[in-house]
Design a protein with these regions (language model features):
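The serine-hydrolase catalytic nucleophile loop
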Residues: 40-53
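Active-site glycine-rich loops that stabilize anionic/oxyanionic intermediates
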Residues: 31, 39-42, 204
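Short beta-strand/loop motif that positions the catalytic acidic residue
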Residues: 194, 200-202, 206
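Hydrolase active-site cap/lid region
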Residues: 127-174
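Alpha/beta-hydrolase active-site loop
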Residues: 46, 80-101
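N-terminal cap/lid segment of alpha/beta-hydrolase-fold proteins
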Residues: 1-27
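Conserved alpha/beta-hydrolase
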Residues: 51-76
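Catalytic histidine-centered segment of alpha/beta-hydrolase-like enzymes
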Residues: 232-245
């Protein structure tokens, strides 16, 4: 059995809300912690399967809604103010909160992210490499800067010489600020500063983030295990998640480096 607890922390006056999952036990001492980051337009429940599995492994697992990053999220903020930089700031605030809890071990923190949350996780891990013990990325959206350069952010189509103030993407409108924050970025340079163990899992049939981005990321990292999930797209089915969690368990035990 595990317990659920709502938590909140703040960033620049905005409240970030999430859920903690951990074993309901009389465990002595501090436990390792895992922070999980959802993708563009998603919410904290997108990675719930993995949070519960991590809790069963003895982790205190934390899922949260990015500020302005999702339609059904509970955190403050507008999607028109959301950028990769604001999401990185959100994640850092959650990390600081988790590290400050009396029952978590700040020396054993795992970071997991999917899609845009994977890109953000990669950036934060590189900026705070000494704080992250292991990094797990599912189909990270390292294509975002290229999408900005071609006017196709979030599935939209716009003229890069006349960038609209509001970009109508699938699901969530974003602003010109988002475009401007990523258009000149090299995502592989942004993430390669993390030299700890990385597990990167990507679908062979991903039509949103081509698998070539995962292959390039694996080359950029110093210590990365890349797994291509045959037949999988952008997001995994329950059957595929069952396979993925086997790799996650192996990686956590230290055999997936």
């Amino acid at each position: 059995m595990f317990m659920e607890r709502e938590f909140c922390c703040t960033r620049d006056g905005l409240t970030i809300r999430g859920t903690e999952y951990r074993e309901d036990s009389e465990r002595q001492g501090r436990c390792p912690a895992a922070v999980l980051c959802h993708g563009f337009g998603g919410n904290r429940y997108d990675l719930l399967f993995y949070a519960k599995e991590l809790a069963a492994m003895g982790y205190a697992a934390y899922c949260f809604d990015f500020c302005g990053g999702c339609v059904a999220g509970k955190s403050d903020g507008s999607s028109l103010d959301m950028t990769i930089d604001t999401e990185a700031a959100d994640l850092k605030a959650v990390l600081d909160y988790v590290k400050g809890l009396p029952y978590t071990d700040e020396n054993h923190i795992l970071l997991m992210g999917g899609s845009q949350g994977g890109y953000v996780s990669g950036i934060v891990a590189a900026e705070r490499p000494d704080e992250i013990e292991r990094l797990i990325l599912f189909y990270p959206a390292l294509c975002i800067p290229d999408a900005a350069r071609t006017g196709t952010l979030g599935g939209a189509h716009y003229d890069v010489n006349r960038i609209p103030e509001v970009i109508r993407t699938f699901g969530v409108p974003i602003s010109k600020k988002f475009h401007d924050s990523v258009v000149d970025k090299d995502p592989f340079s942004q993430i390669c500063g993390y030299r700890g163990p990385v597990l990167l899992i990507h679908g062979s049939e991903d039509m949103i983030v081509n698998v070539s981005y995962a292959r390039q990321a694996a080359e950029a990292y110093e210590n990365c295990g890349l797994e291509i999930l045959q037949g999988a797209g952008h997001g995994f089915t329950q059957e595929q998640r069952e396979k993925v969690i086997v790799s996650v368990r192996r990686f956590i035990k230290g055999r997936g480096e």
